[in-house]
Amino acid sequence: ANLLIATGHKVEREYYFNDAGSQIEQLGASVEAAYLGLLGRPAEAPADGYKGAYVADLATELRAEQGDALADLDPEARRARITDWSFRRMLAGIRQTLSRLGVEFDVWFSERTLHETGAIAETVDDLRERGVVEDRDGAVWLRTTLFGDAKDQPLIRSNGAPTSCGADAAYYRDKRRRGFDRLLFLWGADHHGYVPRRMRAVVRAFGDPDDTAEFLIGQLVSVVRAGQPAKMSRRAGDIATVDDLLDEVGKDAFRYTMLRFSLDAPIEFDVEAVTRQSLDNPVYYVQYAFARISSVLRQGTETGFTALGVDETDLGLLDHPMEAALLRRLAAFEEQVVMAAVQRAPHRLTRYAEELAAAFHRFYAECRVLGDDHALSSARWWLVEATRQVLANTLALIRVDAPERM
């Protein structure tokens, strides 16, 4: 989103959360079983429910907040109360985690609203008028095979309940009706394959060009420590939460490391490597370059150096090979931003930051910035100042801090 805004697009960030359907019901049933277990009232958890350690954490928090009285409610009322509480608590946790990450959304969109406002029924009627809906076996089907899908997709089940495809189609229609002409959907690895194919058919069913929507699929992240699978603190299971990683490595190391990989590449997150204070750690390497640049400029100011005005400076004096290499990297900034935006490839910016940092480190090793030649020192001063600005802009786009000191 930052890249699209930087290249002139008007962007709205939206988080779509699934608060309807079987997943929420399974969450509620799983927490309910764990809650009753804490009270010595064993209850069988659903076979297809959630089994992570966070379920036990939620149950413990629920009991601490609401006591034991929920156990005496009518089972249906208890399930509804616990389901609603569990969902709200999970959503609050997601918001808090994203805030720690420096990720902001303009809109939080509830799937439930599509059901409650009749948007799904309206979507079915719209598609029916377009001649791409068929009633079959008591269900309502979208004829996605007309648009390249392997098989038709149900919109409404035979029992009258909307399917996930029905909700997804309604959500797509809602966004288009709100005036958006380009839609980017970002999903997790569990949506690989069938969801993008199905949604491309939905786009075509509405008569929209293929490039109206893009479907970006992330990959799984494996967390390791010194090459071995890492068990994070607090958890007995085989998952590591983003909060676990943030507690250990911090926002900058987490964001930078994740953004070094293209979206379609599996990620191995080495906890020790990303926190190592050495130049073989990319985030440290880049931030150290910025701190060194700041130190050079600070020392110049403290020693009373005053550069010639930029218009008075003879930049033609920058003829050392390392100066030329640094200038070339600086000149590439705008192209890198545009290409990263067009290709939906933020990892281009982390690689660019590393290349720019490397070019500066080589320049610094071979070219004395503040010497006896005032004209040359002024030219090099402005080169360092330009490097500082471009590196700061690059880090700002990926929302990683640019430290003045390290």
What function would you assign to each model-found segment?
Residues 1-406:
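Non-catalytic interaction-recognition regions
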